Regions:
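A glycine-/polar-enriched beta->alpha junction
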Residues: 75-84, 91-106, 118, 126-144, ...
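Periplasmic alpha-helical coiled-coil/stalk elements that build and connect Gram-negative outer-membrane
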Residues: 138, 154-278, 375, 379, ...
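Small/polar, glycine/serine/threonine/aspartate-rich low-complexity segments that form flexible
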Residues: 55-66, 109-137, 141, 251-269, ...
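Heptad-repeat amphipathic alpha-helical coiled-coil interaction surface used
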Residues: 90-92, 97, 142-144, 149, ...
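Terminal intrinsically disordered/low-complexity segments used for targeting and assembly
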Residues: 1-75, 230-278, 441-465
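Transmembrane beta-barrel architecture of outer-membrane proteins
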Residues: 71, 123, 169, 214, ...
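Amphipathic alpha-helical coiled-coil segments and their boundaries
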Residues: 72, 79, 86, 131, ...
Length: 465
């Protein structure tokens, strides 16, 4: 075979065997993405279709007339950019499995030339080297990448739960801030009436000036509290929109509801202490730490396997002076100067770190479960006390009205009783808010919704490819 024929054959084989991916540009414009973010809407028909595919949700009409926790959480799963980042990271981790599974490519070398003083004698040489991995290195790489990919998928679930938790807390905060403003407006009206009646009695010489001054100061202070509460409504509204992943303007005009916010469950009805064991074994951060530990195990196995050198098998061919020569060369690295001790020691240390992180994650879960249950029980007890106080003051208010109707009390006494009831109602509302927030901490510790009627805690599919 002539040298030029050999070269043509090799070139043809190389070109046929190479099928590289083509680069596709994906330009991104900050101005365009900002416009897309600002144009997000809860009325988006694509959101409607995606929400229906999540199971347990059936919109009576679209756009929704009201938005509750279930629908707002689904909207957050659709819009929140943190989930997009987590999904992208999970996809990158999946791609790492492909990288780990790749086998090393063979190499080829061609060396044509001429021999003799006149260069009339052609020479052609062709060498082919096929690397062969030994000791199961490829399998350990795949196992390592697979466990890290699983950890990344679990982190996606962890991010989804965090999004749900933030939406829940933000919705509770907003609804209770609106309720606080309503109560404060009513209390301001009562304070005004109290000041008016006190002024009348002062001018009649029935009360001293300090009593009137105190009433006026209380009214001024309450108005300042109302002004701050109005600002808090706007702040919590914006916080809820941010938790969903939409601009504040997209949430304007939407009717937000939570039908059972006033009736949190009794602490005794919460999952029993056996739920601690379930959380210790199944919370996503624990499972993620376990996958990272298994990845560290595979990493250590890979470094140990690297003690055994790979083999290169190299069949060769040469043509010289009209004769064909075949050869077979087997080569390998001689592990004389080191046996990969350093990387093995690092991998062993990384496995210890991963084991310690798993234990720390379980310890955190245990503390979270116990602390959140205790915090909820305390908040619920405070709520019960505040509810009882409201009931007592409402009875006193009714008694004052009865005395007024019987001519045995004046209007100021009734207004004073109404003010006491109003203050106690605000205290009860604050206790209810703290109870609901504490209940959210219990859900976070167990990483599952305590209301069986709500939708899944995690999205079933990605809203975008």
């Amino acid at each position: 075979m002539k040298p030029h024929a050999i070269g043509a054959l090799l070139l043809s084989a190389l070109l046929t065997g190479c099928a590289p991916h083509r680069y596709h540009a994906a330009p991104i414009s900050p101005a365009a993405t900002a416009t897309a973010l600002y144009s997000r809407s809860l009325d988006d028909p694509d959101l409607d279709q995606w929400m229906k595919g999540q199971g347990g949700f059936d919109a009576p009409s679209w756009p929704l007339p009201t938005w509750d926790l279930q629908s707002l959480v689904l909207a957050a799963y659709y819009f929140n950019p943190d989930l997009d980042v987590a999904r992208a990271n999970a996809t990158a981790s999946d791609a790492a499995i492909t990288t780990a599974a790749m086998k090393p490519n063979p190499s080829v070398s061609v060396g044509p030339g001429y021999q003799g003083p006149s260069g009339a004698q052609p020479i052609a040489a062709f060498d082919f080297s096929l690397p062969i991995e030994t000791a199961g290195k490829r399998g350990y790489r795949i196992a390592n990448a697979t466990h890290l990919s699983a950890a990344s998928r679990l982190q996606l679930g962890q991010t989804a739960w965090t999004v749900r938790s933030r939406v829940r807390a933000a919705l509770i905060d907003y609804l209770f801030s609106v309720k606080a403003v309503e109560l404060l407006h009513r209390e301001v009206d009562l304070r005004k009436e109290y000041v008016r009646l006190t002024e009348t009695r002062y001018h009649a010489g029935e009360v001293p000036l300090p009593d009137l001054t105190t009433a006026r100061i209380d009214l001024t202070s309450l108005r300042q509290t109302l002004s701050a509460a109005d600002g808090h409504v706007q702040t919590t509204h914006a916080a809820l929109a941010a938790a969903i992943g939409i601009p504040d303007s997209a949430l304007m005009g939407k009717t937000l509801v939570w039908s059972d916010a006033d009736s949190p469950p009794d602490p005794n009805s919460l999952p029993p202490q056996s739920a601690r064991k379930l959380a210790l074994e199944n919370r996503l951060d624990v499972l993620g730490a376990l996958e990272k530990y298994e990845a560290a195990q595979s990493g250590l196995q890979l470094e140990i396997a690297k003690q055994y050198p790979d083999i290169n098998i190299g069949p060769g061919y040469s043509y010289e002076e009209g004769s064909n020569f075949l050869s077979l060369v087997v080569s390998s690295v001689l592990p004389l100067r080191n046996h990969n001790e350093g990387p093995i020691a690092e991998a062993e240390a990384q496995r210890k770190v991963a084991g310690a992180q798993l234990l720390a994650a379980q310890s955190t879960v245990l503390a979270d479960v116990d602390r959140s249950r205790a915090q909820y029980a305390a908040a619920y007890a405070t709520l019960e006390g505040a509810t009882a106080t409201v009931g007592e003051l409402e009875q006193q208010q009714q008694s004052a009205l009865s005395l007024l109707n019987a001519g045995e009390a004046d209007q100021l006494t009734v207004v004073a009783a109404q003010l006491q009831t109003s203050v106690s109602e605000r205290a009860r509302m604050d206790a209810l808010l703290q109870t609901q927030l504490a209940l959210g901490l219990v859900e976070d510790a167990l990483q599952r919704p305590l209301d069986s009627g709500v939708t899944s805690a995690f999205p079933k599919s990605a809203p975008r490819p």
